[in-house]
């Protein structure tokens, strides 16, 4: 199953400007990634939502980010399973990652990298054609 096309539907973020703190290379930045996948009725199109919460050493919010896509597959998905979802995500994650890394660089978080989305899977919930994947990503040390 291949991704035929994708459209960026929404890019929303909130930066904690009240913090007024500059981050140094030896600080740990923690990221929490949530992924929501919902297949539409035709089972060929899907909504894909990524949510990232970024926290500093003191568990103070640095950034909240929500990115929504609509993906169109080349064929109708016949068997929507956890392994199928992970396969689609593994193909799409590099596209998402490139967008986010460019965004991070534009707001001054030049050395923060996104870990691979399967780093430490916390849980998967399935509701018919709707999956919610939560991942607690490894803390990333700025360097």
Regions found by a protein language model. Give the residues of each.
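N-terminal intrinsically disordered, cationic/polar leader segments
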Residues: 1-91, 98, 105-131
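Aromatic (phenylalanine/tyrosine) cluster motif
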Residues: 130-131, 135-140
């Amino acid at each position: 199953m291949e991704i035929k096309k994708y459209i960026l539907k929404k890019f929303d973020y909130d930066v904690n400007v009240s913090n007024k703190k500059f981050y140094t290379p030896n600080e740990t930045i923690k990221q929490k990634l949530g992924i929501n996948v919902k297949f539409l009725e035709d089972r060929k199109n899907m909504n894909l939502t990524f949510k990232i919460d970024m926290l500093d050493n003191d568990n103070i919010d640095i950034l909240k980010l929500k990115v929504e896509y609509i993906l169109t597959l080349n064929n109708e998905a016949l068997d929507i399973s956890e392994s199928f979802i992970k396969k689609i995500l593994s193909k799409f994650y590099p596209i998402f990652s490139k967008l986010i890394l460019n965004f991070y660089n534009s707001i001054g978080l030049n050395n923060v990298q996104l870990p691979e989305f399967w780093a430490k899977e916390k849980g998967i919930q399935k509701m018919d054609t709707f999956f919610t994947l939560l991942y607690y990503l490894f803390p990333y040390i700025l360097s």
